[in-house]
C-alpha cells in the first residue's frame, strides 16, 4: 500500500506555540517525530492517544506528545495538507 505524504501548513498560533515549547526546554525532537509520522500518513502509536476533537475544534484531531504536551492538527485529504494548528499544555490550549 502506498503511503500518502502531506505538505505542511502552519497556523500563526502554532508557530508561537512552537517557540514557547523551545523556551520551555521541551524535547522538540519528540514533536518532530510525531509530525513526521503524520506527514507520511502513518498511524500514531497508542501512547500518543490520537483522537477527534469536538466543540470549537470539530474537524481537528489531538494527540499527546507527552502527558501534558499536545498537538492539535487537521488533515485535509482532498488537498493533501497537514495543518498544524496548536501545540502546548492542556491549560495553554483549553484553559483547563
Where would I find each of the regions flagged by the language model?
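A short, surface-exposed loop/turn module that caps and links secondary-structure elements
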Residues: 36-64
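Enriched for short, Lys/Arg-rich terminal
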Residues: 1-7, 13-16, 23-29, 63-65, ...
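A ubiquitous structural signal for well-ordered alpha-helices
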Residues: 17, 33-34
Amino acid at each position: 500500500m502506498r503511503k500518502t505524504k502531506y505538505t505542511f501548513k502552519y497556523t500563526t498560533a502554532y508557530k508561537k506555540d512552537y517557540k514557547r515549547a523551545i523556551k520551555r526546554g521541551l524535547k522538540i525532537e519528540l514533536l518532530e517525530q510525531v509530525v513526521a509520522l503524520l506527514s507520511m500518513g502513518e498511524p500514531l502509536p497508542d501512547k500518543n492517544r490520537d483522537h477527534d476533537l469536538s466543540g470549537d475544534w470539530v474537524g481537528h484531531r489531538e494527540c499527546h506528545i507527552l502527558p501534558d504536551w499536545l498537538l492539535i492538527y487537521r488533515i485535509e485529504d482532498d488537498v493533501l495538507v497537514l495543518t498544524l494548528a496548536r501545540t502546548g499544555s492542556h491549560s495553554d490550549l483549553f484553559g483547563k
